[in-house]
Amino acid sequence: MNQFDSALHQGTPGVSVLDNRGHVIRELRYYRHPDTPQEIAERIAFHQYDSYGFISQSIDPRLAERRKQDSSVKPNLSYFTALSGEVLRTDGVDAGTIFSLNDIAARPAISISATGVSHTWQYEGENRPGRVLSRSEREKDREERIIERFYWAGSDASQKANNLAGQCLRHYNSAGLNQTLSIALTGTPISACFQPLLESAEPEWQGTNESAWLELLTPEIFTTYNRADANGETLVQTDAMGNIQRLAYDVAGFLKSSWLSLKGGQEQIIVKSLTYSAAGQKLQEEHGNGVLTTYSYEAETQRLIGIRTERPAGHLSGARVFQDLRYTYDPVGNVLRITNDAEATRFWRNQKVVPENTYIYDTLYQLVSANGREMANIPQQSSQLPTLSPIDNNAYTNYIRNYHYDSAGNLMQIRHTSAAANNSYTTNITVSKYSNRAVLSSLTDDVDKVEAFFDAAGRQNQLLPGQTLSWNARGELAKVTPVARDGQESDSETYRYDANSQRVSKMAIQQSNNNTQTRRVLYLAGLERRTIHQGNTLFETLLVVKIGEAGRAQVQAMHWELGQPTEVANDELRYSYDNLIGSSGLEVDGTGQLISQEEYYPYGGTAVWMARSQREASDKAYGYSGKERDATGLYYYGFRYYQPWAGRWLSADPAGTIDGLNLFRMVRNNPIVLHDPDGLAPGFFERISSFRKKDTLTISSLKGTGPFYTRSESEIDIDFLFSRQDRDKDFPPQNHKELSAEDRREVLEVSSGENITSANKSSKWYAGTHWETKPLKNNTDLVVLHNGVQGAAGININLNDIKPGRSVLVTAGTLTGCTMITGVKGNNFYALHAGTGTPSENWVTGEHGVTDNFRMLNKLIPDAGIDLNPEAVNDSLLTILDYFDNGTIAYNGKKGSEIHRDADNILNYRTTGYENTVGVSFSLLTKDKNGEVSASTLLELGELKPHKKHRTRGQFGMTELKYEARKNTVVKLR
């Protein structure tokens, strides 16, 4: 069988059926398997909407078919939506029933989880910015407790001196106490500290006596220091144990080298050099151990086609190629073959074992077959790693894996065949009749009993036979009991998380021969502290310094404060080199010697496992997809845990249907190409630095990204004047920081760049997905200027007020009938957004749109001398455009009402030839470290196409649209 057969995909389009309101009511997919190309199955997902156009329910193809015979089968999701579009109740077969209610400012007020846990938020009162003060939690049969407290800085001299005015000073949360001590002008924290909760304590921040709360905390306080440049990039980080990381960047803002100084030691180089292509892709990186990694890309598609890691000629240990991976793709980007030219072809039991993997897909791009090599003595895949083998002393055999899925995308069977090694087996997974919940058949092979292995929120309560799982009130895995003993202490592994659901500690207890061994891990900024106790005696303390910037590689320094193993050098450096999806395949030490080598099956099992010593192998914590592997065999991704032996998540997606109706499916069943960075949604792998969120922001880098909004509002650095004019009310220009929530409601959003999103909360849809996985840095202020209520809104930013190294990004969101005008006059930037009312017969700016723009400009510039009663035609807008030194207009002009000037700085987004066109206007204002200010506007014509329904962020149901840019231009304003 050929790996890619174009005939297989003929006649298998994806079809969306729209109703007369433009809503997708059917999604048709045509399924054909490579083994049975003559058979084709039509799979239909159904969606319904209420009379107001809000989504009311969805059902996937599998449940839709079952519902025809069994009326008790429920849709995957049902929504009850308020008139405002806010989803008040979500009923899901995977994640249960969730209630949520926002306040008048669209802030979370109350939520009730599927397990009956309620959370309540409290905010500042009137005449304050409306920031959150606390979050309370109530479990069934328990008293309500406050699990989060926020204390915000005022404006006294000491706080201003540390740039803390308006910032959160102290945050008591589920992990302990986080404090911000000082912040740079760019927004980068200069010093911050963390004080963990006692192991025996629970977060209960009742009352107002902070001294009483401190009794719940450990006496240890861990403080991290940073020094940043004018662009907000970290130059030096000193971790809580005194280890220092230093970084240097090139003129484009990319990392070029980095160094590490362990506490009390000499500085050593980690990254010698990094080179990049014009597109910003890494071409070559050389590390301090002399190992060189070279990346190659396909010219036409820019897909990664080669990763070569080697000790080059002239290295003190001699030349050696560690890996030379070559990738072959089909036309849509599925990997067909991976060849490792660094490995030799071997022979075992009369079979030829080639160092390559091949893959076959169905018409839905799900992996259905994989060929590769494995260790000849490897047992059936389980939660445990296979027996370790010495390096270069392995016999290999070929394997074939076949994967079978149901029509909802549930992986139901993994059939493993290795004939030469007599190692063939089948892993079956039992899927519930009523949901996408599923467990290994070793737990049950009865589809009617699957639901009993999950709680109401879709969290699995048993891992393997006899291994129980416990979850906390916030839906986080709290405890695994791998061995339960009657009348004796059980083995266990427990976890604790911060307010962002990120793990901050892990404790594993194991009983053996009347002795208790306790292993603890504390996760700090750039550091892990691992300890081992035998009984009450501290036996070992290992500090793992995690290098934040090292190219694509992950680098760790292993420093033993106590109990250093004799076979391992103290302060050993471990460089981990990855593959296309970020899996750690090679570990090399600081002298360029190989420590370990690991190869993986699709979906994450270990096929090859070699190391030079047992102890060094046991210290390897990160493996498949670059994620941490726990003693349970689970991989920790950040928001969820993953079962590699079942190819499934342990719990329903906390982000809802961000990746489809199946909340348990792993990376769309395409694990060779796709990588999930945090357990929420898959994408293509990109190593994210712990120091930087995104490379230097430029106006050109915004092309094709799609409209943006704010996920939640927060304080920003820049001051500016804001004015709005509604149909029945005027608001005079005022500093935006002095506005009440009512003054800015539905018109102005401000936030730091980390809170950027593609989600339009008021319209209940996602304008693409770009910003969901690519947040900006916090040295960028976001300003989203909506129109007034059948009126207009405007802002005036003094460019001199932008601080060096900071940027301001201004947008109107998605323009579907409004006008956005931007311009610079002298040292001031202006943006005017005219609203939509009842459109005129001749133009689409709004009921009084042209006049509103003129009046808004006069509000912001009283001496502008602009006529307040212009002719109501779009050509009149040229008067405003010409008033500015440089400016732009994005408008929606019907045929016959266009602006009669053909210029790059004017965009009519009502262009014929495309459907569902929208306009985008991004203005980027930047001041570099030398104090030079630049201002530019990107004008873009885009299309929003029906793509998916019911993408959700938490409990809020939303529609996902696909954004495609059709044409764009950048206009320099200054």
Curated annotation (Swiss-Prot):
Keywords noted in UniProt: Repeat, Secreted, Virulence
Record family assignment: Belongs to the RHS family.
One Gene Ontology cellular component: extracellular region
Source superkingdom: Bacteria
Region spans: Cytotoxic necrotising factor domain: 699-940
Residue spans of the RHS repeats: 165-179, 290-304, 322-336, 354-368, 398-412, 490-504, 570-584, 596-610, 630-644
Keyword tRNA-binding belongs to the record: no
Entry protein name: Toxin subunit YenC1
Quaternary structure, from the entry: Semipurified toxin complex consists of at least YenA1-YenA2-YenB-YenC1-YenC2-Chi1-Chi2. The Yen-TC:K9 subcomplex is about 26 nm tall and 22 nm in diameter with 5-fold symmetry and 5 copies of YenA1, YenA2, Chi1 and Chi2; the chitinase subunits may be solvent accessible on the exterior the complex. The Yen-TC:K9 subcomplex has no insecticidal activity. The native complex with additional YenB, YenC1 and YenC2 subunits is 16 nm taller and is insecticidal; the toxicity-conferring subunits are present at about 1 copy each.
Disruption phenotype: A double yenC1-yenC2 deletion is no longer pathogenic in C.zealandica larvae.
Task performed by this protein: Part of an orally active toxin complex (TC) with strong insecticidal effects on larvae of the Coleoptera Costelytra zealandica, Acrossidius tasmania and Adoryphorus couloni and some Lepidoptera larvae. The TC has an endochitinase activity.
Known regulation of activity: Toxin complex is secreted when grown at 25 degrees Celsius or less; at higher temperatures the proteins are present intracellularly but not secreted.
Annotated compartments: Secreted
Record's keyword annotation contains Repeat: yes
Region (RHS-repeat associated core domain): 600-680
InterPro entries given in the database record: CNF_Rho-act (IPR008430), CNF_Rho-act_sf (IPR037040), Cytotoxic_necrot_fac-like_cat (IPR011324), Rhs_assc_core (IPR022385), T6SS_VgrG/RHS (IPR050708), TcC-like_repeat (IPR041508)
Gene3D superfamilies the UniProt entry points to: Cytotoxic necrotizing factor, Rho-activating domain, RHS repeat-associated core
Gene that this sequence comes from: yenC1
Organism: Yersinia entomophaga
PANTHER family linked to this entry: PROTEIN RHSA-RELATED, PTHR32305
